[in-house]
Amino acid sequence: NTLLGLAIAIILALVAALVGPLLIDWGTHRSLFEAEASRLIGVEVRVTGPIEARLLPTPSLTLHDIEIGNGGDSKIRARLLGFEFALGPLMRGEWQASEVHLVGPALGLGLDASGQVRAPNLAIKFNPDNLSIDRLNVEDGTVILSDAANGAHATLQGVWFNGEVRSLLGPFKGEGAATIGGELDPFRIAAGRYTEDGALKLRVNVDPVNRPLSIVADGALTLAGAKPKFDGTLSLTRPVEIAARSATQSGETVSQPWRLSGKIKVSTASALMQQFEFRYGSEDQGLKLTGVADFQFGKRPHFDGVLSGRQIDLDRALAAADGTRPPPAAAIRRIAQLAGGAFRPAIPIQIGIGIDQVTLGGNSIANLRGDISTDAGGWNLDRFEFRAPGFTQVKLSGHLAVKGAGVSFTGPAAIEAGDPKLLAAWLEGRAATAQGDVRPLTLRGDVTFGSDKFAVERL
């Protein structure tokens, strides 16, 4: 909006010169342009490069090497800003830009120690509704984001955007992409009109190129008070088509879709996700969990959440296309591989889990409780316990490590089985044989379990 305001100011001065010659050395009038632009947007404006203008047959203006602001992190720069206006509306006093081309914009957006946005303090002196843009093209932009409270920063490079703007107050829409941390993230954006109370209805879709994921945020962005807030919904999805493509690229035989969605409140310090729902697998056969989550931003971001469910059916969720299902031991290993591979986050995560009943191997696991957290090598399990077939109570803690397609667990475990033969038959996916003398089994030790090893130490 700042750069658009600058061009409005300069085009006003240009139209005022319509009675002059058609070919003018506009560079000699540089100080006039800068003074008028500075007056209209309330901050210092400099145009250090060439100025090219054409009045007929189509009014157009091209500026090179633009600087806006009084210095510091809030200064805005651009290598080129070009305008082309529709002649008919211009003669009627309407500013309808048929095309605006912006090359190399660079700006910094940050939060000070109190969480307020640091940006140029503009005081625009024209009506924003007087400008509409049919085609807005931005290329090779750079945006530097920073937070003074904790020193965190991020850089968006190679930003491009193509869209249309009905007014500087909205609505507007378009698509583009930005490179963040070496990864390309295409996006689509649509916004309503900026209201008097400082709110903007906004919908953003992000489809990262290097991650099998689709992100959608839809809600109201409040900009009043220099502390932005977002209140709406967030959806993180790996839909069927992305799951299939991911499986092909990774060599997997099966790759299930999943979705995490819910209400979200975002401030400059945190994001609180309320009443969210996690689904894994298809709509008719997948499992569903609900919960709440709190994501704290900053130099050391972390994610804390709680997942709960009354009853989930892993037999249906993990069944193959022909309906066959893996035995419980293989299913547990597969779930561990999925947790370490598909859900390997880039930030620390801690999640509490509580599920009343899980159907697996045609039988039930009851009262599954525990905490999981992440580290560089996988997941940590803390105070996990559940009841399994064979009148079995299982308690374990330890580390679930994932390397490539392999998974291993190391940690202390305690098993109390009233019918160990029934427990073994269930784990192997076979029918229980006729029972003779059944004796309970109590087992404690440090367990190591992997694709090619099972060992118990200090038994």
Predicted regions mapped to residue ranges:
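Flexible beta-edge/linker motif
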Residues: E52-G115, I124-S146, F172, D294-A317, ...
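Intrinsic disorder/low-complexity detector
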Residues: R310-A346, I351
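Short, structured motif recognition centered on aromatic/hydrophobic residues
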Residues: K201, A271-Q275, L307, G352, ...
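Short, low-complexity cationic-aromatic patches
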Residues: S261-A271, K299-R300, R344, L360-I365, ...
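N-terminal type II signal-anchor transmembrane helix
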Residues: N1-G42
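Extended intrinsically disordered, low-complexity coil regions enriched in Ser, Thr, Gly, Ala
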Residues: G281-Q296, S364, I372-T374, N380, ...
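Intrinsic, low-complexity N-terminal interaction/targeting segments
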Residues: S246, P328-I335, A339-F343, L360-L368, ...
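Elongated, acidic membrane-bridging lipid-handling scaffolds
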Residues: L80, A97, P105, N121-P228, ...
